[in-house]
Amino acid sequence: MAPISKVFDYLVIGGGSGGLASARRAAKHGAKVALIEASGRLGGTCVNYGCVPKKIMWNIADLVAKMKTAKQNGFPNSQLGSFDWGMIKRKRDAYIGRLNGIYERNVNKDGVAYISGHASFVSPTEVAVDMNDGSGTQVFSAKYILIAVGGHPIWPSHIPGAEYGIDSDGFFELESQPKRVAIVGAGYIAVELAGVFAALGTETHMFIRQSKFLRKFDPIISDGIMDHFQHIGINVHTNSLEFKKVEKLPSGELCIHQQDGSTFNVDTLLWAIGRAPKIQGLRLEKAGVKTLPNGIIIADTYQRTNVPTVLSLGDVCGKLELTPVAIAAGRRLSDRLFGGIKDAHLDYEEVPSVVFAHPEAGTIGLTEQEAIDKYGESQIKVYNTKFNGLNYSMVEQEDKVPTTYKLVCAGPLQKVVGLHLVGDFSAEILQGFGVAIKMGATKSDFDSCVAIHPTSAEELVTLV
């Protein structure tokens, strides 16, 4: 083993959102910090293959959906031309490249040593890095080591021909728009990408094992989005059995063989069946770090593993796999380790999240059923509203996108324990109401706020 070449206070493995946030915060507290990233690009899944490029595509798809009602809003000569997928990919890639550069400059500005290479544990305080520049292996040590390597898409490798498909990362590598796509999966990634494909004109098919998708969300979200998907022509194949095999035809099309003997041809097959922690090659056993059978690193709300010198956060821990969660957890961890804030840690309760579908949806807190299970049915009061926003007032009924809200309250004070939104502007609306709910707002607090009229959000302070 090569000798230890550098000693740090803090080694961060993984240059995604959580690792970057924790490394930079630790450096600002005066710690000597190194950040190790294998891919050669900082930003992690969110910047390179997740939130950012996805939201770019969602924005474009949402623009298309809005433009389809232009004639009904007084623009009789308005018409959509063909969509230039390749041009958008080039511009999107360039934008992501600029973000990668910004992250690297910020790391350097904060005095964090950026190490480009593949890390593996040597001991609970030592990490070996195979350097990406070909210079060989170097060994680094630190008082604390943070594992923030994120996750990766899962593939059904047991299905013959599955490799002819792509995953959510592969979506952003597509050079041209497929005419016909099959998406396998029932989570938010499958739903979001299906919405983008369909809005841009791709014939879109979703294959899900159960009767609905987004089953972990409140029914107003899963049912609301599913109803609208079917209304706009997305083909949702429910109770679908696992494919028998996938065959690549001479034409380049993919032929999906189903269990009943039927076949289905598409240009692109996208697997969105889940994600797994990216722990391959880390040699966690050398540090003694414990994981669950599925590879998730066991860590508490203070991000502590079973090894005192090793911390972990983000998707690799399986707790609320959301970028802002990893960022917040990373900063609080560094505040505790190096900033003198002894009890700093992230509260994983009441974290808002959004599904950028068409229509978009947002949620915070408990679903109606979760609230009943926790407090008892007699202690729960639910308020619902469904309406068409004023932005659809000039639009024919069949082209309107309904908005649905649900407020879940508990106890004699009717504390708001859950809020679920489906409809335009849900993400922006939820951020503000999320603050109120995090502060312990009650239904009477909501009622005491004078409505802003005319808005969709005013419905939440006028519910009866």
UniProtKB/Swiss-Prot annotation:
Coiled coil: none annotated. NADP(+) binds at A186, I189, E192, R209, R215, G274, E321, V354. Disruption phenotype: Required for cell survival. Causes proliferation arrest at the G1 phase of the cell cycle under aerobic conditions. Its EC number is 1.8.1.7. GO terms for cellular component: cytoplasm; cytosol; mitochondrion. One of its GO terms (molecular function) is glutathione-disulfide reductase (NADPH) activity. It holds the Pfam family Pyr_redox_dim. Glutathione binds at S17, R24, Y103, R331. The keyword Cytoplasm applies. NCBIfam families: gluta_reduc_1, PRK06116.1. Belongs to the class-I pyridine nucleotide-disulfide oxidoreductase family. Homodimer. Catalyzes the reduction of glutathione disulfide (GSSG) to reduced glutathione (GSH). Constitutes the major mechanism to maintain a high GSH:GSSG ratio in the cytosol. This is Glutathione reductase. It comes from Schizosaccharomyces pombe (strain 972 / ATCC 24843). The lineage of its organism: Eukaryota, Fungi, Dikarya, Ascomycota, Taphrinomycotina. The gene is pgr1.
